[in-house]
Amino acid sequence: MGRGRVQLKRIENKINRQVTFSKRRAGLLKKAQEISVLCDAEVSLIVFSHKGKLFEYTSESCMEKVLERYERYSYAERQLIAPDSHINAQPNWSMEYSRLKAKIELLERNQRHYLGEDLEPMSLKDLQNLEQQLETALKHIRSRKNQLMYESLNHLQRKENEIQEENSMLTKQIKERENILRTQQTQCEQLNRNHDVPPPQPQPFQHPHPYMISHQTSPFLNLGGMYQGEDQTAMRRNNLDLTLEPIYNYLGCYAA
């Protein structure tokens, strides 16, 4: 005899209702996972208990992505069904409020999960998805950190090269300046050495003896000036008279 059809109605007994909810919830999550694996379908399931406790399953890595995709699809479908009616239609603020409230609750719950809080209601599959999300986030964080460290290292290397080039230029300029100063100092020393050479000392004048006839020409006063055409004999006679003049003076003294 076959089993009779169970009448669907609210279970009044709280304990029986909670037990039934736990069994049916586990079966529902299992069926959602089976259809996702067997049929390669994207499945998302959200269940709230009578106490407001949330249970969910998603074949994607994040429930938020599925909800955003559903919202885009629903909006596009509504646009196709009534392209002109939305212009004059009044917005349903109650539905908009409920949608935003659910989205905020979902974001807050995901944030608690990322912080390691409120993990008791999560199943093994949910924990694996959360772990995968955290690992992906850590990979992105490490990649960004390594990129910043690499950029900082390259900046420091470029700064070091610039400082080395500037140091080389300054060293070259200092050497050139030292060479110029050394050359100028050498030139100054040579000039000072040339100025320090003592001038030739004048020889003391020796008076000739009266009895000695000097072969050097004595100074004389040339009143008329000398010309190249003058008689050379007259010049020699004048020189001889001037040379013998001291002897004549001396003999004249004895004659007197």
Curated annotation (Swiss-Prot):
Main localization, broad class: nucleus
Q: Which InterPro entries match?
A: MADS-box/MEF2_TF, MEF2-like_N, TF_Kbox, TF_MADSbox, TF_MADSbox_sf
Q: Name one GO cellular component term.
A: nucleus
Q: Where is the K-box domain?
A: 90-180
Q: What GO biological process term is on the record, naming one? A: positive regulation of transcription by RNA polymerase II
Q: Name one GO molecular function term.
A: RNA polymerase II transcription regulatory region sequence-specific DNA binding
Highest taxon of source? Eukaryota
For this protein, the record's SUPFAM superfamilies field holds:
SRF-like
Q: Which UniProt keywords apply?
A: Activator, Coiled coil, Developmental protein, Differentiation, DNA-binding, Flowering, Nucleus, Transcription, Transcription regulation
Location in the cell: Nucleus
The chain positions of domain MADS-box read 1-61
Q: What does this protein do?
A: Probable transcription factor that promotes early floral meristem identity in synergy with APETALA1, FRUITFULL and LEAFY. Is required subsequently for the transition of an inflorescence meristem into a floral meristem. Seems to be partially redundant to the function of APETALA1.
Assembly notes: Homodimer capable of binding to CArG-box sequences.
Name of this chain's protein = Transcription factor CAULIFLOWER
The species is Arabidopsis lyrata subsp. lyrata
